[in-house]
Amino acid sequence: MGRAFEFRKERKFKRWGHMARVFTKIGKEITIAVKQGGPDVTGNPRLRALIQTARSENMPKDNIERAIKRATDKDQADYKEVVFEGYGPHGIAVLVEAATDNNNRTVANVRSYFTKSGGSLGTSGSVDYMFDRKCMFRMKTANPYDLEELELELIDYGVEEIFEEENENEEKEIVLYGEFTAFNTIQKWIEENGYELVAAEFTRLPNVDLKVLEGDAKADIEKLIERIEEDDDVQNVYTTMQP
């Protein structure tokens, strides 16, 4: 198995603090997708995938519709996607993805989280190179398949790693990781080849050796991550600490 499998194995049970956080995160992504590609799911594959993701998280239909409507509401400020890079205590690199309608607020908040933890917010590019941007899909099918043959076929579509895992209902799903730019190509293949798209997202995988921390040192980083993730503007947090 590759690094995507190991990374996911460590993180798959690490969820946002509660359901409302999940809905807020997906809702912002839906709004941004509508802004970029329009509200018609037929011509907006990213929106189509996000709606499937929302359904897999049991996000109410009203929440999905509100997120779509927000994108077309001229009275609502646009969300801006921003990335923050820095170092937490013990030399751990931290990359934060946010979606905000008030950049000044978000910058001030994120900087304070780093400072209070004994870390520091860095400049653009200071830790970004330690993480590779990827797309991730979860799909399933009732039909028989051969995972090795599937992997060989999907390599031509930008898939770099494929493996199986069980979801919370103990149903088998196929997980795909691919090149960041291959999102639409992979999604199209899934939709055209009889597989059910369960969820899809963009993510980052560390490309450096992860640092092992224990005891109080590990707790320091976990506290920083928790503080950052509690911010409503924050979408994702990645670090170079071994989970």
Predicted regions and their residues:
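N-terminal cationic and glycine-rich segments that engage phosphates or anionic surfaces
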Residues: 1-113, 118-122, 127-136, 182, ...
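Positively charged, low-complexity, intrinsically disordered RNA-binding extensions
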Residues: 136-243
